Amino acid sequence: MGILFTRIWRLFNHQEHKVIIVGLDNAGKTTILYQFSMNEVVHTSPTIGSNVEEIVINNTRFLMWDIGGQESLRSSWNTYYTNTEFVIVVVDSTDRERISVTREELYKMLAHEDLRKAGLLIFANKQDVKGCMTVAEISQFLKLTSIKDHQWHIQACCALTGEGLCQGLEWMMSRLKIR
């Protein structure tokens, strides 16, 4: 009886899960958002403020907020943290010069009270570019193994082709099932 109730509940439970997509400017956040929502590449320009789209996967609704990553906008990221269940950090795998800035912003976010229960998905974007940092290198630079208070996953991807994006969403879905 309990299994039947659970299955029926899942059919009609239309709870929305808030996701924020952050990262430095030109990392590919908006391209990823529109790959999720339209399954295609759209021409983007730097995001001033945010873009928001609802993504539905197997009756699970995600409200995804893509937040601008320019230096002048990063201080406002915390205004989006309330009720966030997942943080997607998009890393430009070709940008070795700013990986330390990404690490600094990541740990600022993780220290915020409103994100204490949020899961963390890191997309290592632009993996199609020769000479880019590998997932292992990015993991090491970001010191991901030191993160103990958040469930996290790093996923190689290419926003332009969509490669790797579904695996990231599958990880998020698996985290929801555990709760």
Curated annotation (Swiss-Prot):
Sites of N-myristoyl glycine lipid attachment are: G2
User: Which segments cross the bilayer?
Assistant: none
- Which GO MF term does the entry hold, naming one? GTPase activity
Gene this protein is translated from: ARL5A
Q: What is this protein called?
A: ADP-ribosylation factor-like protein 5A
Residues binding GTP are 23-30, 66-70, 125-128, 159
* A Pfam family reported for this protein in Swiss-Prot or TrEMBL: Arf
What this chain does, per the entry, is described as:
Lacks ADP-ribosylation enhancing activity.
Q: Name one GO cellular component term.
A: trans-Golgi network
The family assignment reads: Belongs to the small GTPase superfamily. Arf family.
Q: Which GO terms describe its biological process?
A: intracellular protein transport; protein localization to Golgi membrane; vesicle-mediated transport
What keywords sit in the KW lines? GTP-binding, Lipoprotein, Myristate, Nucleotide-binding
